[in-house]
C-alpha cells in the first residue's frame, strides 16, 4: 500500500508539472506539438539521471526511486499524447511535421537518457571527491 501511495504522490506532481511545462512551451507553437516533445526529452534526461544514480551509485532508496521514476516521471512524460498528436499530424497530411515529431522525440529522448547517465556519473564522481 505504501508503494502505491508513493506512486500516486509522484504521479500527481508529475502530471501537474507536465501540464504546466507543456502548456507554457506550447503557447508559442500552435502548429507543432513542441510542448509534448519538451516534456518527453526533459523526462528522459531525468529518468536516465535518477536510474543511474539509483542503480549504479546507490544514491536513492528503492522507495525514492519508485516515487521519482514510476510516479513523477511516469506521469510527467507521455507516450499517449505523443501518439495522439502524431496521428493528428498524419490526419492533417502534415507529413513533414509528423516525421520531424517522431524522429525528434525518439532520437532526442534517447540522447537525453544518455546525457542523464553522463550527468549521474559526473555527479557521483563529484560527490565521492567531497567525502
UniProtKB/Swiss-Prot annotation:
InterPro entries in alphabetical order: FluC
UniProt GO molecular function: fluoride channel activity; fluoride transmembrane transporter activity; metal ion binding
Function: Fluoride-specific ion channel. Important for reducing fluoride concentration in the cell, thus reducing its toxicity.
Main location: membrane
Regulation: Na(+) is not transported, but it plays an essential structural role and its presence is essential for fluoride channel function.
Listed NCBIfam families: crcB
Transmembrane segments annotated in the record for this chain: 4-24, 32-52, 66-86, 95-115
A Pfam family assignment: CRCB
Cellular compartments annotated: Cell membrane
Keywords, in A-Z order: Cell membrane, Ion channel, Ion transport, Membrane, Metal-binding, Sodium, Transmembrane, Transmembrane helix, Transport
Membrane topology: Multi-pass membrane protein
Gene Ontology BP terms: cellular detoxification of fluoride; fluoride transmembrane transport
Residues engaged in binding Na(+): 74, 77
Family from the record: Belongs to the fluoride channel Fluc/FEX (TC 1.A.43) family.
Protein name: Fluoride-specific ion channel FluC 1
One GO location term (cellular component): plasma membrane
Catalyzed reactions per annotation: fluoride(in) = fluoride(out)
Amino acid at each position: 500500500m505504501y508503494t502505491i501511495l508513493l506512486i500516486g504522490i509522484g504521479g500527481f506532481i508529475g502530471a501537474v508539472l507536465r501540464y504546466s511545462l507543456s502548456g507554457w512551451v506550447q503557447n508559442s507553437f500552435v502548429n507543432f506539438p513542441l510542448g509534448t516533445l519538451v516534456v518527453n526529452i526533459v523526462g528522459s534526461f531525468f529518468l536516465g539521471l535518477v536510474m543511474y544514480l539509483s542503480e549504479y551509485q546507490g544514491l536513492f532508496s528503492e522507495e525514492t526511486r519508485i516515487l521519482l521514476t514510476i510516479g513523477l516521471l511516469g506521469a510527467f512524460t507521455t507516450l499517449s499524447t505523443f501518439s495522439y498528436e502524431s496521428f493528428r499530424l498524419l490526419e492533417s497530411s502534415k507529413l513533414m511535421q509528423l516525421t520531424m515529431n517522431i524522429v525528434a522525440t525518439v532520437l532526442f529522448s534517447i540522447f537525453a537518457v544518455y546525457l542523464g547517465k553522463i550527468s549521474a556519473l559526473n555527479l557521483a564522481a563529484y560527490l565521492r571527491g567531497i567525502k
